[in-house]
């Protein structure tokens, strides 16, 4: 389509616009050109907070409304952040105000947007083909919803339920098209089959629909019950009977090899369910840890927010101080006032550009939808009065500003709704793809592991339980050993410290005694020299008798000194021998303690390795539990959808039966009337014949 369209506005009466507010008429009627081009939006949708509108803004608005509605050329680029630019680019498509119900077919809750539902009487191969076709159709529909606003008129034929006051399209065939579309959507509501259902129908044996709900474990935790839908228990028994009948009719026709495979798959499913019960305690622990971590995360986020607020407060104080310093000088105040005025003008200009752009967008969508006017209709159109002054609702800001602001608020709300819906659709698509991939992986795993027997599965379960119990016992033993090792290590350290202190004291005493011995030896040598010198002197000076008496005295003194010294030396030797013995014993104790510590360290390393292996096994089991929980939730959702569809089909069947009964009654009444009329005609003919014969 071209970028310009002729402006189309149909009028049947002169008072057609009596129910429309005056402020909305210029956006649709005052354009002198027949088309309005699409223009890029301004850079910033929220340039500044609200300020009182100036006379310049009123003049620009009045000129833009009374003149041409061609978009104003974009000014020089201002310094905007990346977020503002991306936000402005994302708001290029606006939802129209006058045709707000026109985009209702894009709403995710409508009939066309819902996924079709499987019809009851179809085979598995047809269901798989329908799944692939429906996936392709949904992808094409989603891509089509993201197209540009300029669309063909045939694409817009789905939304003919709109009763626009001032815009009536010419296409009268839209009601028929809408009815056909509704019939197609109602028929297509029975065309999709969930992957879980199709695969379960090829795997479940006879009577599995009746035995499967009873095999499920009754005691569940509160968290699992909250995740499952509460309505499953009410309709589980009749649904299982119906599904068992359907599946039994199918499985009777199949080969015995398929029956054996289904038996194996059912046994595998029972084993998996029993493993879920064993691993549920681990899931609880993980959830508690996740809650603790989430609480810590919230506290950290609160701290970050408080710090950011504190930083903002400091920045505001700095700006305030800078402004106070700038306002102190006269030139700075003039410059700041001029800058404020310039900023106000720029912000008002941006706001006016945004309003003009939105009005142009709405007008272009309107022109893209409706036909152009003929020459006669264009001649009859009069947006402004030919004679007299302009009406006040066209130029006075008191009338226009509230209407335009309300119009902008309405458009912003619509834009937010569109964005939220698109994000939800994208997230749902991603989740659906992940679920499909997980289902495929699970089915491949089940097909690979179908060769395992029930005994082996039970043995594996018992081994897993024993391993878990052993892990718990080992963990407790490790904790006890850690505590004992810490206590022993602390005791040994204290004893070693005491012994080392004693050794140091003994070594100090030994050194002091050795020093005393050396001093005494020196004194002994000095005494010997003096004795010899005195003896020589006495020999020359003293007589023999005197000398003998003196020598006897000296000998006695020497003997006494020697006895004392020998006693002291013996005591010191005894002490030294005792100290050496104690030192040897302490060294032996120290070596024994070191060997014991090394042995304990090796045991700790081995226990840590075993603990790591156990933790890895526990993490693998936790992941398996989470996968099984997600699969169970998906299965519950699919079952809920199937039950709702079954209820809808039963309701429609009852309605059709009532219609058929009423039609049969009407038919019988008509037949009785026809018979009575024929009888009356026969009687009248006989009477006529009788009258003819009489005449």
Swiss-Prot record:
List, as start-end ranges, the regions of compositional bias called Pro residues.
Answer: 34-49
Q: Where is the composition biased (Basic and acidic residues)?
A: 251-271
Ranges annotated as spanning the membrane:
none
Q: Where in the cell is it found?
A: Cytoplasm, Cytosol; Cytoplasm, Cytoskeleton, Microtubule organizing center, Centrosome; Cytoplasm, Cytoskeleton, Spindle pole; Cytoplasm, Cytoskeleton, Microtubule organizing center, Centrosome, Centriole
Looking at the UniProt record for this protein, which Gene Ontology cellular component terms does it annotate, in alphabetical order? centriole; centrosome; ciliary transition fiber; cytosol; mitochondrial intermembrane space; spindle pole; synapse
Instruction: Tell me if Transcription regulation is a UniProt keyword of this record.
Output: no
Q: What's this protein's name?
A: Centrosomal protein of 89 kDa
User: What organism, scientifically named, is this protein from?
Assistant: Danio rerio (Zebrafish)
Gene for this protein? cep89
């Amino acid at each position: 389509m071209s970028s310009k369209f002729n402006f189309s506005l149909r009028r049947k009466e002169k008072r057609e616009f009596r129910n429309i507010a005056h402020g909305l008429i210029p956006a649709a009627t005052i354009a002198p050109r027949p088309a309005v081009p699409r223009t890029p939006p301004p850079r910033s949708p929220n340039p500044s907070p609200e300020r009182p509108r100036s006379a310049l803004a009123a003049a620009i608005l009045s000129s833009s409304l009374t003149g041409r509605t061609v978009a104003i050329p974009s000014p020089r680029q201002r310094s905007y952040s990346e977020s503002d630019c991306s936000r402005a680019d994302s708001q290029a498509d606006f939802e129209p105000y006058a045709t707000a119900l026109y985009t209702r077919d894009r709403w995710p809750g409508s009939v066309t947007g819902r996924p079709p539902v499987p019809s009851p009487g179809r085979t598995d191969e047809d269901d798989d083909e329908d799944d692939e076709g429906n996936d392709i159709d949904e992808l094409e529909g989603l891509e089509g919803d993201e197209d540009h606003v300029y669309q063909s008129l045939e694409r817009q034929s789905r939304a003919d339920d709109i009763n626009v006051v001032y815009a009536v399209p010419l296409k009268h065939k839209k009601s028929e098209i809408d009815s056909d579309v509704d019939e197609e959507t109602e028929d297509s509501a029975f065309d999709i089959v969930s992957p879980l259902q199709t695969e379960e129908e090829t795997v479940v044996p006879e009577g599995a629909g009746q035995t499967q709900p009873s095999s499920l474990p009754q005691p569940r935790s509160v968290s699992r019950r909250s995740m499952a839908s509460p309505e499953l228990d009410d309709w589980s028994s009749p649904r299982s009977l119906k599904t068992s009948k359907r599946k039994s009719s199918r499985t009777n026709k199949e080969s015995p090899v398929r029956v054996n495979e289904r038996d194996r798959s059912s046994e595998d499913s029972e084993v998996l369910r029993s493993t879920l019960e064993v691993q549920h305690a681990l899931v609880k622990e993980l959830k508690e840890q996740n809650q603790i971590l989430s609480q810590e995360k919230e506290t950290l986020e609160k701290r970050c927010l408080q710090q950011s607020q504190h930083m903002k407060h400091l920045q505001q104080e700095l700006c305030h101080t800078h402004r106070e310093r700038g306002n102190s000088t006269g030139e700075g105040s003039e410059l700041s006032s001029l800058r404020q005025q310039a900023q106000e003008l720029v912000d008002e200009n941006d706001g006016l550009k945004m309003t003009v752009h939105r009005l142009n967008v709405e007008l272009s969508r309107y022109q893209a939808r409706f036909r152009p006017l003929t020459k006669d209709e264009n001649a009859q159109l009069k947006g402004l009065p030919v004679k007299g002054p302009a009406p006040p609702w066209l130029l006075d800001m008191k009338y226009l500003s509230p209407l335009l602001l309300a119009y902008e608020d309405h458009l912003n709300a619509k834009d937010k709704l569109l964005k939220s819906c698109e994000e939800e659709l994208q997230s749902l698509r991603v989740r659906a793809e992940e679920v499909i991939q997980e289902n495929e992986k699970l089915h491949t795993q089940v097909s690979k592991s179908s060769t395992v027997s029930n005994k082996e599965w039970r043995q594996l379960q018992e081994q897993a339980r024993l391993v878990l119990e052993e892990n718990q016992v080992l963990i407790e033993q490790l904790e006890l050993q850690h505590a004992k090792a810490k206590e022993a290590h602390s005791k040994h350290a204290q004893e070693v410290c005491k012994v080392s202190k004693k050794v140091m004291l003994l070594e100090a005493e030994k050194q002091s005694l050795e020093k005393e011995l050396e001093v005494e030896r020196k004194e002994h040598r000095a005494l010997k020299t003096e004795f010899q010198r005195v003896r020589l002197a006495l020999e020359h000076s003293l007589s023999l008798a005197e000398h003998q008496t003196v020598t006897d005295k000296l000998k006695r003194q020497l003997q006494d000194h020697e006895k004392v010294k020998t006693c002291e030396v013996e005591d010191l030797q005894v002490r030294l021998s005792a100290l050496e013995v104690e030192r040897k014993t302490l060294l032996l104790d120290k070596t024994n303690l070191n060997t014991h510590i090394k042995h304990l360290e090796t045991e700790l390393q081995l226990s840590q390795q075993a603990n790591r292996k156990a933790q890895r096994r526990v993490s693998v089991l936790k992941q398996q539990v989470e996968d099984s929980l997600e699969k169970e939730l998906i299965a519950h959702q699919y079952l809920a959808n199937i039950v709702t569809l079954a209820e809808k089909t039963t309701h429609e069947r009852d309605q059709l039966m009532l219609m058929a009964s009423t039609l049969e009654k009407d038919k019988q009444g008509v037949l009785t009337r026809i018979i009575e009329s024929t009888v009356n005609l026969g009687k009248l003919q006989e009477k006529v014949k009788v009258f003819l014969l009489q005449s």
